[in-house]
Amino acid sequence: SLASAAYDQGRLAAQAIIKGDASAHLIEDIPTGIYTIPEISSVGKTEQELTAMKVPYEVGRAQFKHLARAQIVGMNVGSLKILFHRETKQILGIHCFGERAAEIIHIGQAIMEQKGEGNTIEYFVNTTFNYPTMAEAYRVAALNGLNRLF
């Protein structure tokens, strides 16, 4: 969000002034959150941007209504969408709406910021998530997306 980005920019500017070192930098992909009902959140590229850039991408989706946690709390509206490169499997964007969307977006953001093989959709397949949680949507979406490659 703009407030969070402005806070980080101010912190980095103060460090540069105090330490005389301006080598620190902000992350490239800053998440957005819209606190409506349901919440909307995203980080990274959109399908429209990837199509315009002619990037070969695939989409993995998870519907919240299929998650145990969403069923338990009665918040079945929502979904998580992961956009990833078809060849490298690098995560390019994550889009979410529904219960806790602005909170769970940071899980994907953390993986997107990893360099090299640390940023792949396979991370979500090979990671153990607490159950039942809304974060489980990442595994469901990752499996959905990888299955589309075959």
Curated annotation (Swiss-Prot):
Entry keyword set: Cytoplasm, FAD, Flavoprotein, NAD, NADP, Oxidoreductase
Top EC class of this enzyme: oxidoreductase
Localization (cell): Cytoplasm
Gene3D superfamilies referenced in this protein's UniProt entry, alphabetically: 3.30.390.30
Signal peptide: none
GO biological process: 2-oxoglutarate metabolic process
Record's catalysed reaction(s): NAD(+) + NADPH = NADH + NADP(+)
Function summary: Conversion of NADPH, generated by peripheral catabolic pathways, to NADH, which can enter the respiratory chain for energy generation.
Name the record gives this protein: Soluble pyridine nucleotide transhydrogenase
Organism, scientific name: Pectobacterium carotovorum subsp. carotovorum
Lineage: Bacteria, Pseudomonadati, Pseudomonadota, Gammaproteobacteria, Enterobacterales
